Amino acid sequence: MTGYSTNMRIKLPVFCLLLEFITIILFAVFVRYDHESDAKQWHDEMRNHSVQNAENDFYFRYPSFQDVHVMIFIGFGFLMTFLKRYGFSSVAFNFLIAAFGLQWSTLIQGFFHGFHDGKIHVGIESMINADFCTGAVLISFGAVLGKTSPVQLIVMTLIEVTLFGINEYIILNIVGAKDAGGSMTIHTFGAYFGLIVSRVLYRDDLEKSRQREGSVYHSDLFAMIGTIYLWMFWPSFNSAITAHGDDQHRTVMNTYYSLAACTLATFGFSALLNGEGKLDMVHIQNAALAGGVAVGTSGEMMLTPFGAMIAGTLAGMISVLGYKYLTPVLDSKLKIQDTCGVHNLHGMPGILGALIGAIVALFATAEIYGAGMEDVFPLISDGSRTAKQQSLYQFLALLVALGFAILGGLVVGFILKLPIFGTPSDAECFEDAVYWEVPGGEGHQQLTVVINNEDPDTQA
C-alpha cells in the first residue's frame, strides 16, 4: 500500500476545530435547556403546580447517568487496552470519539426526540441518550481498532451518529419496538456497522503488523479494569431510561442475574474449549459481559430472574464459541478483521437479545403485567396491537437495525478509504508511535523497527 501520510499536524486540527466550531454554532442556534433545567420554567412549574426540587428528573436519572458515563469513558476505553503497543491510542481515541460523539448526538437525537418550537430542549435524559449513541460508535471502533487514524475515526463518528439517530427513531417511534437497553439500536447496529467498515477497509498485508496485535501480561490486566467497570455498571446502562418504579427495578435485577450467569458460563466454556483446560483472558474480558447485551431489549419486560439467567448463560456460551471458532473464519474466509471481537460480544448477543425480546413480548398479557402494561407495552395496553403483533414488530426492528448497519457501514467504509485521512500503512497498524510521542525514546526506536520491517515498495 502506498501514499500514506500519517502526519496529523494539519489534518487533525482542521477536523477537530472545524467540527467543534460548527457544533457550537448549531448549539447556539438550536439547543436550549428543557423545562427542568431552565431557571424560569422550573420555578414557574414549582410555583404553579406545587412541585418540589426533589421531584426534578435530575435526581432520579443522574445516578444512572454517572454509571453510563463511566462505562463510556473508562469501561470501553480500558477494555481496548489489551493490544501491547496501542494503549495510548485505545484509551485516548476512545476519549476523542466520545467527546465529539456526545455533542453531535445531542443535536441529531434532539432533532428527532426533543425538537419543539424550532429548538432542541436538553436535560439529563438527553445526556444519557447521547452517551448511548456514543456507545454504538465505540463498539464500531472496536472492530477497526489499530487500523485507522484519528481523523478517520472522527469522520466515522460524524456519519454513524447521524445514522444511529435515524435508525433509532425508526425502531422506537415508527416500528414501535421496545429496546431500552439497546440490544438492537446500540449493540447490533454498532457491531455490524463496524464489521462492515472493517470489511471495506480490509488489509491484504496486515500480517506485517500481526506481531503487535496480541497482548502482554500487563495490557490484559489494564483491559480487565474496563471489563470490571462495564460489568458493575451494566445494570444502570440497561435501566437508565426505563420508567421509574418497577420497570427500572426489574431491569436492574434482570441484568444483574444475566451478567452473573454469563460469567459462570464464560469461565466454564473457556476451560472446556482449551485442550489443556486453561482459561483464555480474551474470553473473560469480553464474553463475561455478553449477558448485559442479551437482556438489553427484554430487561424491562417480565423476563423473570431465571429467564434472565438463561439468557446470560446462552450469551456467554455463544460469545466464547465465537471467539474460539468464528473470529478466525471471519478473518480468513470473509476478510473481516475484527480486532476486538465485537461480533462475539455485541453482534451475536445483540441479535440474541432482540430475539429474546420478541419471544417475551409474545407472551405479554394483562394477567402478567396488569396496569404496568402501559409502561412496558403501551401499544398493547391501548389496544393498537396484540402481543403477537408486538412480537413481530420486535423482530422487524432487528432487521431494520441490521439493514442500517450494513448499508451505513458500506458507505462509511468507502468514504474512509479516501487517501486524505492519514491512515496507517499495513506495517504501522497497532502501533502508538505512529501518532503519539511515546516517552523515553521508545517510540522512535519502535517506529524505526516498523519502518525497517516494511517492504521497500510500500514506502510512501
From Swiss-Prot:
Species the sequence originates in: Xenopus tropicalis
Protein name from the UniProt record: Ammonium transporter Rh type B
Pfam families hit by this protein: Ammonium_transp (PF00909)
Similarity section: Belongs to the ammonium transporter (TC 2.A.49) family. Rh subfamily.
Nucleotidyltransferase as UniProt keyword: no
Alphabetized SUPFAM superfamilies for the sequence: Ammonium transporter
Membrane side Extracellular: residue ranges: 32-62, 109-125, 172-179, 242-252, 305, 369-394
Chief place of localization: membrane
Listed transmembrane segments: 11-31, 63-83, 88-108, 126-146, 151-171, 180-202, 221-241, 253-273, 284-304, 306-326, 348-368, 395-415
Gene Ontology molecular function: ammonium channel activity
Keyword presence, ATP-binding: no
Compartmental location: Basolateral cell membrane; Cytoplasmic vesicle membrane
Gene it is expressed from: rhbg
Topological domains, Cytoplasmic: 1-10, 84-87, 147-150, 203-220, 274-283, 327-347, 416-460
Glycosylation-annotated residues: 48
Entry function: Functions as a specific ammonium transporter.
